[in-house]
């Protein structure tokens, strides 16, 4: 299972180009998608879910071209969790999932088994008889993820799946997605870089409608090698000077001053030392700001 995108362009009626000649191949497994707000990630996902038709370019899912004649066939292979989800407020969790699963054409017996399994995996079993309107935002996200998994999709597209979850639940959801991706493709879009560091070996970074990077996480980290510095300054004025001239990925007050992680090809000043413990967040910020 792979998804191929070739010279994809999405241009809206007002002339705004949200995606501009973007090309990418998404292989089996979990594939991360990073980018600032307005980078084009949501538009890309709307195309991949057949909600939005591309203006130009080619997209294919397992060899099936994205066009109106194939949309129904493609939709049967896809599961989708959007960033904003508004499920039926007056239905219970269980009723909502039974209804959504029924729309996907899953048999009742198989549906019951999958609902039971995913309720357990997402720690929602004890909440299955609550009305949707009674749930917290994090719980609604988990229900939304379950509905995206019910048809056992070949291609799962998820937008900010861990929003509103506590650390323990985030880890549970990440582990569930890793297990699910064993024989499938999962496109994982998030602003939480830590989630991608814990789940992905491949990712793409979007900026202004195009892919700034696509490839391995290790390759992205290698790109920032020698460009991450640990600097400790004595006062706020020195800190402001660094912030005015460089990208800063972290800042912390310590006993002997202010510790800052500075991203730069050149050594910022004589007090800075190389940091060889580069994080995915460091590499991402360095790439997008260099």
Residue ranges of model-derived segments:
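Conserved structural motif at the start of ABC-family nucleotide-binding domains
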Residues: 3-5, 18-19, 75
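Walker A (P-loop) phosphate-binding loop of ABC-type ATPase nucleotide-binding domains
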Residues: 36-40
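Helix-to-loop junction immediately C-terminal to a conserved catalytic motif
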Residues: 49
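Conserved ABC transporter NBD signature motif
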Residues: 57-67, 73-74
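Conserved ABC ATPase "signature" region
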Residues: 98, 102, 109-127
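Catalytic Walker B motif of ABC-type/P-loop ATPase nucleotide-binding domains
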Residues: 156-160
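ABC transporter nucleotide-binding domain
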Residues: 172-261
